Amino acid sequence: MKKEKNFFHLYMVSDATGETLISAGKAVASQYPTIQPIEHIYPMIRNKTQLQRVLDEIQREPGIVLYTIIDQEIKQLLSRECTKIGVPCAAVLDPVLNVFQSYLGTPKNLRVSAQHDLNTDYFRRIEALDFTIEHDDGQSSDDLFNADVILVGISRTSKTPTSIYLANRGIKTANVPLIPGIDLPKALLEEKNSLIIGLIASAERISHVRQNRELGKDVSIERYTDRVNIAEELTYAKRICERFGWPIIDVTRRSIEETAAAVFELLSRFREEKLREIL
């Protein structure tokens, strides 16, 4: 009987940056929480010499091999050598590309790093990050009209981390705090071209988060973390969102990624509606 290991080697070989592989590898590996993957990431593998170094590593420490490689010769060499070594080898994107080709009836245009066009995607993300950082926590509210998404909510409803996550996906995101007794920025109330979303959470979760964060504000700690007071803040936030017709996302049981996914869905609908208005 083989002795069970609590780890395995995971090789990710790409002719581009490897981001696609890393995401796929982590997603699948997370389904096996009791076994720790030892990740070996090899980006920009585009010739036999580079590949041979990878194969030498696989030979020394066998494991699962995932790859995204366009060049057929390099691809076949990797697959062939993995078979010789006796390790599983999978082309992550091939099944998806084949489905697209079959459905669209058009051969795929094989292009190395096509999914990472620096002239569009990379600089769009950088621009979005710059904008989001400048518009964190109600800053620079005069040009909110340049935002794709504006997140509003009381303190500690994950506005900032969600904004940064969205910015990393190229979405210009501003966030504005909702504070009872303090007027909302005029620009926010007048904004029609940005999607405005309210974030809420349970009073219990917000209280817990507030207790474990440095306040950084001149407020009473007891009042700031008191659940009754937080419930009143949440009621105020919900009324504001309802008054202006802003959709609400409850982040109580959502990760940042799950909250962002909900934002993307709302943004898609919002843009479709705007497009229909134009047409």
Swiss-Prot record:
- The yes or no answer to whether the keyword Nucleotide-binding is present is yes
Q: Where does ADP bind?
A: 153-160
Q: Where is the signal peptide?
A: none
EC number(s) per entry: 2.7.11.32, 2.7.4.27
> What are the protein's UniProt keywords?
Kinase, Nucleotide-binding, Serine/threonine-protein kinase, Transferase
Q: What InterPro entries does this protein's entry cite?
A: Kinase-pyrophosphorylase (IPR005177), PPDK_reg (IPR026565)
Give the catalytic activity.
Answer: N(tele)-phospho-L-histidyl/L-threonyl-[pyruvate, phosphate dikinase] + ADP = N(tele)-phospho-L-histidyl/O-phospho-L-threonyl-[pyruvate, phosphate dikinase] + AMP + H(+); N(tele)-phospho-L-histidyl/O-phospho-L-threonyl-[pyruvate, phosphate dikinase] + phosphate + H(+) = N(tele)-phospho-L-histidyl/L-threonyl-[pyruvate, phosphate dikinase] + diphosphate
* GO terms, molecular function: ADP binding; ATP binding; phosphotransferase activity, phosphate group as acceptor; protein serine/threonine kinase activity
**Keyword Kinase listed:** yes
Family to which this protein belongs: Belongs to the pyruvate, phosphate/water dikinase regulatory protein family. PDRP subfamily.
- Please explain the role this protein plays, according to its UniProt record: Bifunctional serine/threonine kinase and phosphorylase involved in the regulation of the pyruvate, phosphate dikinase (PPDK) by catalyzing its phosphorylation/dephosphorylation.
NCBIfam families noted in UniProt: PRK05339.1 (NF003742)
Annotated protein name in UniProt:
Putative pyruvate, phosphate dikinase regulatory protein
Q: Which organism is it from?
A: Bartonella bacilliformis (strain ATCC 35685 / KC583 / Herrer 020/F12,63)
